[in-house]
Structure formats: C-alpha cells, structure tokens
C-alpha cells in the first residue's frame, strides 16, 4: 500500500517559517551584524553546535535601552541558530542573557560568572564591568576548555578567544577631534566617562585625552 508522509509538527512548521524569512525582515538586524565583519561571525552559516548545547551571555546591566537591545540580540541569535541547524523541542540550543541587578556591579557580575561556569556552557560571552576582575574565573574557564568571548568591553586576559567591540581608541580620538573643532581649538574641556573600571571607558578616556593634549 501507499505510505503516508508524516504531517509536519507545529514546531517543524515554525522552524521552516523562520528559514523562509523574507529579505526585508532579515535586513532589520543583518545590516548591524555586517558592520562587525570580519572580526566576528555575522550570521549562522557554518556554525556547528550539538543538540542541547548551552551558551551563556553576561552583560553589565538589565532594563536600560542599550542592554535591552543586547538581550534582544541574544534571543534572536538563539532563534537563528536553531532555525539554521533544524533543532526543535528539547534539541534546541539554549542561549541565556544574565546581568547584575544593579548596573555595573563588579561583585554581582563575578558571582554570575561563577554560577554560569558551574553549568559548563559550551561558550561564555561577557561584557566586563571591571578590567581587573574575572581573572580567576577565566583561568577556570580555560582549564575547563570553555571558550570566553568578550563584547562591548573586553579584557587583557590572554586566554580570551575573541573580542567583539567598538574600536575604542578610534572612538575616543574622533570624539576629541570633533570637540576641539567645535571649540575652535581653545578653552577648557570636561570629559564625562561612564565608569572608571571598564576597558572601553579607560581606552576612550586615554585616547581622547591624548588627542587633546597632543594636537589641540
């Protein structure tokens, strides 16, 4: 007799629909990802992950416009990965976003990293609040062969697998140049830096100060 083709489940239909996303919908966020190429993956093509793999992303804060966008990006990445690999149900890759309850709290972030490493993720992405923190945790991650990728604000730790961030030196330099231009290269300037501990803030402050001192 004829063999009936099994009907697609709702989950499989959803995956297929995600695969068939229109070009217009893709452009909503793909353009932003293209900007960081080739420093990091800007799509899911060629990425190989096992069923049920867990990836942990740790930010600096919750509930602000910037970090809400980061969190949305994490969710989108998980959806894209599962759609690309065809994983459904319990097979899905899990990607979570966690951050300190109080923005830029160093101790809370270190504790979060400890907790996440205890779950043995296949990789950790972290935006580091304090450049001097997390060294012990990074050693543990290295010993456990858990890759660490920094984003937004990185670390000098040699074992970091990759960094995805703005060129902070270039950003600080350009900000100083434009400031000096608006001031007509005369007068006094005040720099307001968001914090005094993160790599991003320190690099931008130094670059801006160096530019103003040397050339204006």
Where would I find each of the regions flagged by the language model?
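A residue-level marker of the well-folded mature domains of exported/periplasmic proteins
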Residues: 2-216
């Amino acid at each position: 007799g004829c063999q009936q083709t099994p009907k697609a489940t709702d989950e499989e239909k959803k995956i297929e629909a995600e695969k068939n996303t229109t070009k217009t919908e893709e452009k909503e966020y793909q353009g932003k990802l293209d900007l960081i190429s080739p420093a990091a993956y800007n799509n899911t093509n060629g990425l190989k992950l096992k069923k049920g793999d867990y990836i942990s992303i740790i930010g600096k804060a919750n509930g602000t416009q910037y970090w809400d966008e980061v969190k949305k990006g994490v969710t989108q990445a998980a959806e894209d990965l599962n759609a690309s690999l065809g994983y459904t149900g319990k097979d899905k890759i899990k990607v979570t976003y966690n951050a300190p309850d109080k923005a830029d709290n160093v101790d809370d972030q270190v504790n979060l990293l400890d907790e996440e490493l205890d779950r043995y993720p296949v990789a950790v992405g972290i935006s580091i609040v304090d450049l001097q923190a997390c060294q012990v945790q990074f050693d543990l991650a290295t010993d456990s062969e858990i890759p660490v990728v920094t984003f937004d604000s990185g670390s000098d730790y040699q074992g970091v697998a990759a960094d995805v961030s703005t060129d902070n030196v270039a950003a600080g330099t350009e900000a100083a140049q434009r400031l000096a231009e608006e001031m007509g290269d005369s007068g006094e300037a005040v720099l307001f830096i968001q914090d005094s501990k993160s790599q991003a803030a320190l690099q931008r402050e130094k670059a801006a100060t160096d530019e103003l001192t040397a050339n204006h």
